[in-house]
Amino acid sequence: LFSFVNDKRLLIYGLILGVFISSFITGINIMNYYLNSFELLISKSSVESLFITQRLYLGFFIVISTILLLNIYQSSVNKTQKYLSLLLIIYFLFMLFLISSRSALLIAVVVFLTTIIYGLKPLHSFLLVVGVGLIFSTIIITNKNLSSRFLYSEDSIRPSFIDKIKTHEPRYDIWKFSGQIFKEEKPYFFGIGTFKTQELLVSKYHLIPIEKRKNWFIERNFNTHNQYIDIALSYGIIGLLIFLIFVKEIVKFSFKNIHSLNLNISLLLFLIVENIFHRQLGSFIFALTLVLALFLIKSKNEKNINC
């Protein structure tokens, strides 16, 4: 569908505008909530209703928009467009920290490191990677909101970080049960299908000993929350290998343009924490990201030819 749009810049500008509006309204809601309640906002699940777009997806959209803005800033000869792009980049980075989307922040760090490695010599890249890692770690440890989101610092009962993950991160149980299903069903060739995969997951949720947690998992009807695991279970190892070959070709082709590469890396990392093909929105995200990544490569090639 997106490939039929002749001027892909309209897709880029439309996406950036939509993400800006959603994040701006969400930011206002967050600020109002914080000013009225004086509570630690980002760590509370009750604030999800303040997000116009679900936090996980909003964070990903912000990362994608930032990458596209970096491409505009680098390629544009219009000073006004450059300044506007830079201002929006700063705004989106601020919003990333405000909404405290863990996956988006980690993807953003990986994108930044990829850009460093792509453009610098190995020694300089190594030093900058170490520096960025130390700075990011310091921010996580010292910022109360981020420390709560990443390190579960508000939990003073459980002694170890692993125990905190087991308690507070639903993906721990989801991925554990998915692994059990893989061992039991042995979907080595053609898989067991999406319906049976979900059915078996729900049956596993009934085994959770804590009643409140068990009911929450069953009520939410969690899928695998990992696209790669879902493909392996639903379509077998053969299906996963075919998908990974497709992924390999995408990454290989996008090496021609750092921003295209970063778009694809962001998408592939996002698939680790979200099963996007179970949502219509997710399928649109997958298609749109690939179309825009391809467009960035083509536009760069056309620019080189014109030069």
Features from the language model and the residues they span:
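A membrane-periplasm/extracellular boundary helix in multi-pass inner-membrane enzymes
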Residues: G119-I162, K176, Q180-E185, T194
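Hydrophobic transmembrane alpha-helices and their immediate junctions
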Residues: P122-F126, L233-L267
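Long extracytoplasmic/lumenal interhelical loops at the membrane interface
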Residues: I162-K176, Y188-Y235
